[in-house]
């Protein structure tokens, strides 16, 4: 009779451990898939640099570049505080890893080691369009062209341009020659 009670207790403990293991596994599987689904809603959130910033971890690299946009010969002002998310009181809730502090065109990039930041990420954060056919609210159509230069050298990488320290990016929207 005593032996049966010990066996029942051992069976109960074993069954409890198996149940706990199964429930823990189900919880973690559901939690990780929910996180992946919410991140899939925004391509930028898939990038390593934004994930790093969302975790509140300091960056490994902090560098600057200059971005100049010209539309029909007129320089466009790049707004102050692109990349700052604020609450209703104006307090900063979050700072994206690619951001501005003023309207000079100086872009700050704060990344992890081995992260790749692209110019398209900056435009996504800004909430503006940029590609070979579009810049801000301007479309090339048949009469216009977008030319892009890095350090005065023509490039055709547009939104896929990799941001590097101390480069000068000039984007010109103009009538085709």
Regions found by a protein language model. Give the residues of each.
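Ubiquitin-like/PB1-type beta-grasp interaction modules and other compact soluble beta-rich domains
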Residues: 2-177
């Amino acid at each position: 009779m005593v032996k049966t009670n010990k066996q029942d207790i051992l069976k109960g403990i074993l069954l409890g451990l198996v149940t706990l293991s199964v429930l823990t596994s189900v919880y973690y599987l559901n939690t990780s898939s929910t996180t992946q689904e919410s991140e899939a809603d925004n391509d930028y959130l898939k990038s390593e640099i934004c994930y790093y910033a969302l975790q509140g971890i300091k960056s490994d690299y902090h560098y600057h570049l200059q971005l100049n946009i010209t539309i029909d010969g007129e320089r466009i002002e790049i707004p102050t505080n692109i990349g700052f998310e604020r609450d209703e009181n104006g307090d900063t809730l979050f700072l994206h890893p690619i951001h501005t502090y003023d309207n000079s065109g100086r872009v700050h990039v704060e990344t992890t080691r081995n992260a790749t930041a692209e110019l398209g990420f900056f435009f996504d954060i800004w909430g503006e369009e940029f590609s070979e056919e579009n810049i801000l609210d301007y479309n090339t159509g048949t009469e216009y062209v977008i030319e892009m230069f890095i350090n005065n050298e023509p490039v055709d990488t547009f939104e896929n341009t990799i941001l590097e320290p101390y480069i000068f990016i000039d984007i010109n929207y103009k009538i085709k020659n």
